[in-house]
Amino acid sequence: EKNSNLNFHSLDMANWHQLKDFCNKSNCFDYIVLNAGSIPDNLVLNDFSVEHQCASQLIGHYYLIYMLKECGKINQNARIMWVSSGGMYLKKLDIDSLFHNQEYEKVATYSNVKRAQVTLVEELSKQERWENVKVFSMHPGWVATYGLKEALPKFFSLMKNRLRNAKEGADTIIWLLLTEKSLRSGSFYFDRKIVSPYLS
């Protein structure tokens, strides 16, 4: 059903020139959910020779909010949410491989980028630039999406009866956007609670 209050803009998050143009022309935001995702089978580089997952889901996400902030398009007390993944629990952050990915393996790269998202959010929350904005990371659990099925068919087949549906996956995202409870910027959320981003 058409909604006159909704506007759709198609963006390639790895195309940083396109992101800059969007930020210059966009309206202001109270809520931003950073949820772009892809797991290419083979190494793909953007125009700046950065691996695609890193270029789109880490640098692209950051560049988008950075430019929106520079353009005065993020309102005071806005909430910015990075949708990470439980897959990041599989990986210790490897900064070198983010930018010099010589031996590309799609799942390891995905896990590393998702780990980097969570680490970056922790650091952003400490910066003066973001002091009037709430910045979070979260993971929605394993959700039965077409992207997951295409990228990890064996995992999808093995776990399909335990995967969450879209509504379940979106629950904490929506809650973080709308709750009136006190939220801690820089924290990592799962099922409406702050959890450790590390396995103990």
Q: What spans do the regions from the language model cover?
A:
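Conserved hydrophobic beta-strands of the Rossmann-like cofactor-binding core
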Residues: 28, 32-33, 80
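A conserved hydrophobic alpha-helix of the Rossmann-fold in NAD(P)-dependent oxidoreductases
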Residues: 19-20, 148
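A short, exposed helix-loop element centered on a Lys and neighboring polar residues
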Residues: 65-67, 122
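Ankyrin-repeat alpha-helix packing hotspot
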Residues: 58-59
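Catalytic loop of short-chain dehydrogenase/reductase
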Residues: 37-45, 51, 76-132, 139-158
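Rossmann-fold cofactor-recognition segment
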Residues: 2-17
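C-terminal helical subdomain
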Residues: 158-199
